[in-house]
Swiss-Prot record:
UniProt KW Transmembrane helix keyword: no
GO process annotations (BP): defense response to fungus; killing of cells of another organism
Gene name per UniProt: LCR64
UniProt GO cellular component terms: extracellular region
UniProt keyword list: Antimicrobial, Disulfide bond, Fungicide, Plant defense, Secreted, Signal
Protein name: Defensin-like protein 178
Domain of life: Eukaryota
Localization (cell): Secreted
Signal sequence coordinates: 1-23
Covalent S-S links between cysteines: C27-C66, C36-C55, C39-C60, C43-C62
Organism: Arabidopsis thaliana (Mouse-ear cress)
Entry's family note: Belongs to the DEFL family.
Length: 90
């Protein structure tokens, strides 16, 4: 029986590690367009001021904390149009 419990220790350790790593990673997003021109302004257009703007491989990269569960404005608009279509069809 001791051997069976010791075989479960390694998978449990990996599960804990992966759970912690996912929580501590920030969210990155590329803004594709022209070469890195006005990256800070581009990031501020879509994200809060807590994001950091960098140029990476000729693209703007917005780095910062992950947003909460609320969808971004772009996705809220898409979802609201789907709701309108569903209301029209029903």
């Amino acid at each position: 029986m001791a051997k069976a419990t010791s075989s479960l220790v390694v998978p449990i350790i990996f599960l804990v590690i992966f759970a912690l790593v996912e929580q501590n990673m920030g969210c990155n997003d590329y803004i594709v367009g022209d070469v890195c021109v006005h990256c800070r302004e581009r990031c501020l257009r879509y994200y809060p001021v807590t994001r950091k703007a960098e140029c990476y491989r000729n693209h703007c990269l917005c780095i910062g904390p992950c947003p909460d569960d609320r969808p971004h404005k772009r996705f809220q608009m898409l979802n609201s149009s789907k709701n309108v279509k569903a209301q029209i069809l029903s």
